[in-house]
Regions:
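Asp-box/WD-like beta-propeller blade repeats and closely related beta-sheet repeat scaffolds
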Residues: 1-24
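Short coil/turn segments that connect the beta-strands within blades of beta-propeller domains
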Residues: 30-32, 78-80, 135-137, 182-184
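Short loop/turn segments immediately following beta-strands, especially the blade-tip
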Residues: 48-55, 95-106, 152-159, 200-207
Length: 231
């Protein structure tokens, strides 16, 4: 460990998030900056890594709407677009990213709801998981409470998203999801029901079909697929 940063401040939702709570930290695709998504104070803080001192330097802050609860950030493989999932407002915001200048630039170009329901601010719902398919053409998210998974088609030129479906996941309170390397299957971890559900994705019919029985696991929160190196 060469450096550590403590976020300070007071959030806007006293019942849930009233103090700094970093939920996701991810480098920009060009490895110039580190994005710290703070769910508690509705901010994404952007740090530069000083390679001479091995210290983090705050260079910018994405100040998100109050009571939106940013949770996860993902970047497209081409490094041009960033997608931020908002837990409390149940939205995905698309940003155009440019790291070529002295400071990073994030331009908001789209906001889309994680659920087609009208009341996106339903306090019983919480956007929870976000994953980009390996082909770069599809993005998936889960919404806990209503317990659904949504698939969006992604325009590779503009970065914009178009909803293709929102379907139930046959589990209670999904916390995360992951796309398999073949892009044909996805797994959802359900915290309350204590299961991992695997689905086959049919991109032509815009549906998912459960693949086998749910796997039992105690209160799962996250999931990741990591390749095993060949001997």
């Amino acid at each position: 460990m060469t450096d550590e940063i403590f976020h300070k401040g007071i959030g806007s939702v006293a019942e849930r998030n009233f103090r700094p709570h970093v939920n996701c930290v991810r480098p920009t695709p060009d490895n110039k900056y580190l994005c710290a998504v703070d769910n508690g104070i509705d901010q994404v803080k952007i740090y530069r890594v000083n390679k001479q001192t091995n210290k983090l330097e705050l260079v910018d802050i994405l100040r998100c709407p109050r009571e939106s609860g940013p949770r996860i950030i993902r970047f497209s493989d081409d490094g041009k677009y960033a997608y931020i999932l908002f837990e409390l407002s149940n939205e995905i915001k698309t940003y155009r990213y440019d790291g070529s200048g002295k400071t990073p630039e994030f331009e908001l170009i789209q906001t889309i709801e994680t659920s087609p329901k009208r009341d996106i601010h339903d306090t019983h719902n919480a956007a929870s998981g976000l994953s980009l398919a390996n082909d770069g053409k599809h993005l998936f998210c889960t919404t806990a409470g209503e317990d659904t998974v949504s698939m969006f088609e992604r325009d590779e030129e503009t970065g914009l998203l178009t909803r293709k479906f929102t379907l139930p996941i046959s589990g209670e309170y999904p916390k995360d999801l992951v796309i398999f390397p073949d892009d044909r299957h996805l797994a959802v971890v359900n915290h309350v029901s204590g299961t991992i559900n695997v689905f086959t994705v049919d991109y032509e019919k815009n549906i998912i079909v459960m693949h086998g029985k749910p796997l039992k696991i105690s209160e799962p929160n996250s999931i990741h697929i990591w390749p095993v190196p060949e001997e």
